[in-house]
Amino acid sequence: MGIHVPSNVPMESTPFKGMEFEADEIACGFYNEHGKKAGFSIKKEYVNKYKKTGVVTSRRFVCAKEGVRGKDKRNQNVKNPRAKTRCGCEARLVIVLNRDSKKYVVSEFIVEHNHYLHLPSTVHMMPSQRKAATTHAIEIDLAHESGLRLKQSYELLSKQVGGYDNLGFTK
């Protein structure tokens, strides 16, 4: 499959070694936005914290296709086995707390992916990009309480916002 490097991402949206963030969640949001523009989904892999204070000292964000799924312990003759979603991708962003400045600094950034990246037209379907707005969730609940089926309320809401890709979530 080869190595795939995002080429359509502006430099100001690309993290780099030594880049600083005020908080770990800001770094997560920045890397998630980078992933959206590049065509991949992210996940939080691990976090290290001070035991006494609970302050995050380091954190790793990885491509959602990082690692490989373990052997399925269920019956081997299942009709619909789960699709393989992970392929051992090494792309990641690691941040470490600088004790002097109290800021999080990028200590490692690997940009290369070992899988194809998503097209801009399908980016909104990736797990880290799907965010249901509170107002949308309330509207779907109200429609369900009014007797509409979930699919019908989803279609109604998608028409209100101008299409499925503007919703930010799937059924």
List each language-model region with its residue ranges:
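Short, conserved DNA-binding cores of transcription-related domains
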Residues: M1-P127
